[in-house]
Amino acid sequence: AACAAAGVEERVECEIAAVEPPRAEGSPFTLRLADGRFERAGAVIVAVGGAIARGLLPEGVPFREPEPTLGPLATEPRWPRRLDNIRVRGALELWRPDSRGMDGRALNDGGFPMGTHEGERLVSREVGEVMFRKYGVSGIAAFNLRRLVEPGDVLAVDFVPWVRLCDMEAFLNRRRKLLRASLGRDVTWSDMLRGMVLSPVADVLLEAAALDGAHLVAKGETVRMATFLKGLRLPVTGLGDVRQCQVHRGGVSVRAVDDRTCEVRRVPGLYVVGEALDVDAACGGFNLHWAWASGLLAGWSAAERIADLASLADASGSSGSERREGAP
């Protein structure tokens, strides 16, 4: 309604093939349409997805090839397939090899990487929803870590983020003691995990720790289970389902634009906003906020530019008329 009241002309099914900068100062931009026609404009705001922006922009504008981000992660072990579509409230940690690399990391008999972080450093930790998929992990925690992942990184799934690792063994021993008093008998591993995690998750944890759910909890086994409850490891192999990615990373370099107006420094009157700029953020509405905020900055500046150009044109026209009237 506001656009209609202001006399804004809207075009649909009108594909822009290229944006050509003015050939001289004060001249308009040329917008080449896909059907061969063209339009003129005093200012242009590019507000498209990063993958489309490159073909529109003039040569020489610094640009980083877009890649999907804020999406699920593909992982190496096969056990997430058994938990497909199961959600847990937990935490994901992203670990990266240090200068010593990843050589020497042991695997147990089931092929599960042992819960050690020797030779690695913690890159980031996200607490929130973790959703297992056939290819790996999804959910907000995985989406946010996707922005930071590099080849060779490893995820560690923390199923009990409310308990510190240093307190986990004591937590399990106390739980065993309380269950024994409540049940009136010795406690099995199935008893220990029931109510802590979902049954399919418990099966995976027991396999990872090489424990039998029907066997009684033995002294020393709580240390092993604590390790996997606090960090069941998943080597990252890449991006999961690309269709689930919410934004692209890449686009026009932020160094190429004025941070107050989003105007391209080398091409006055050309503005780049939203996903077309190399700006991305975590989940939580930040990317949408950036799209609206950058659009407002560019819109205000473009409107001022158009008004200034109109004033110059009027002044030039008035001067010309005065000269003609005063001519002999």
Which residues make up each language-model segment?
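An anion/pyrophosphate-binding glycine-rich loop and adjacent beta-alpha core
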Residues: 64-65, 75-220
